[in-house]
Every structure is written in structure tokens, then in C-alpha cells.
Amino acid sequence: MTIKLHDLQPARGSKTTRTRVGRGEASKGKTAGRGTKGTKARKQVPVTFEGGQMPIHMRLPKLKGFRNRLRTEYAVVNVGDISRLFPEGGTISVNDLVAKKAIRKNSLVKILGDGKLTVKVTLSAHKFSGSARHKITVAGGSVTEL
């Protein structure tokens, strides 16, 4: 026997009318399934209510400041790292730093002045700190901002 569209019926018990509570004593009237007396019988308290105790959102400190979405992030390379990675000195570009895996590709580079520089370097990067610029020039090198 084949099933046809006009033979289909919903499953038994799946189509029940919802019980209208509080509409007469015969069908969940009077207290409407809420029990007798108390806060829950009269109204509902918010989920966040902590019984009069100081709420968690008021106990925690407020956040100060904000995080600037327009801030430019720089990959940091110190002068000491440059003298370690390039002991022979010479001309160093951003691509050379990527090749030595000091930074990742497509990142802006800032050179900071931590460490000692003993070799003469000609460095090109996006930013230089004052101390890094000073140490490079004292060692006999030069800087170029991109």
C-alpha cells in the first residue's frame, strides 16, 4: 500500500491546545500552578537579583580608559638583536629582518634602543626610538625612516 498526501496525519499527542491558566477553578484556576503566597506567586524577581546582597556588577571595579582601535601596532626589534643577528653589519632593511625571522612579513617595524650595538649598520625601518637612533649614529651607522 502506498502512502498518499491525504492519508498523512500528525502524530497522536503532538497537537494539543495550550492550557489557559487562571481561568476558572476547573482548569488550573485560582493560583494557576504557582502554589500559595510568596514572591513567586505574586511576581517574578529578575535572574540577576541576589536577594538584597550587593550585586556582582556593582562589587566589581569599573573599567578605566579604553582601547584605541586606530592604534598602529609595531613589531619591536632592539638594537641588541640587530648586533646579534647581523654581526657583520651593513645595510639592513625590513626584508632582511623578515629573512632572519626577527619579525613577521607585512608588519610595521620599530627599532628600540635596548642592548649594545658594536657594528656599523645602515638601517631602514618604519620608526626609531630616540635612544636607538643615538646608538646607531654613535656606532657610525645611519637610519632611514620608511
Swiss-Prot record:
DNA repair is among the record's keywords = no
Q: Give the region (Disordered) as residue ranges.
A: 1-42
Q: Which GO terms describe its molecular function?
A: rRNA binding; structural constituent of ribosome
Q: Name one GO cellular component term.
A: cytosolic large ribosomal subunit
Recorded hits in Gene3D superfamilies, A to Z, give: 3.100.10.10
**Signal sequence segment:** none
Task: Write down the InterPro entries for this protein, in alphabetical order.
Answer: Ribosomal_uL15, Ribosomal_uL15/eL18, Ribosomal_uL15/eL18_sf, Ribosomal_uL15_bac-type, Ribosomal_uL15_CS
Which keywords, in A-to-Z order, does the entry hold? Ribonucleoprotein, Ribosomal protein, RNA-binding, rRNA-binding
Entry's Gene Ontology BP terms: translation
Q: List, alphabetically, the Pfam families matched.
A: Ribosomal_L27A (PF00828)
Domain of life, source organism = Bacteria
Give the function comment from the record: Binds to the 23S rRNA.
Q: Cite the record's note on assembly.
A: Part of the 50S ribosomal subunit.
Q: What family does this belong to?
A: Belongs to the universal ribosomal protein uL15 family.
Name of the protein in question: Large ribosomal subunit protein uL15
| Organism placement in taxonomy | Bacteria, Bacillati, Actinomycetota, Actinomycetes, Mycobacteriales
Name the gene behind this protein: rplO
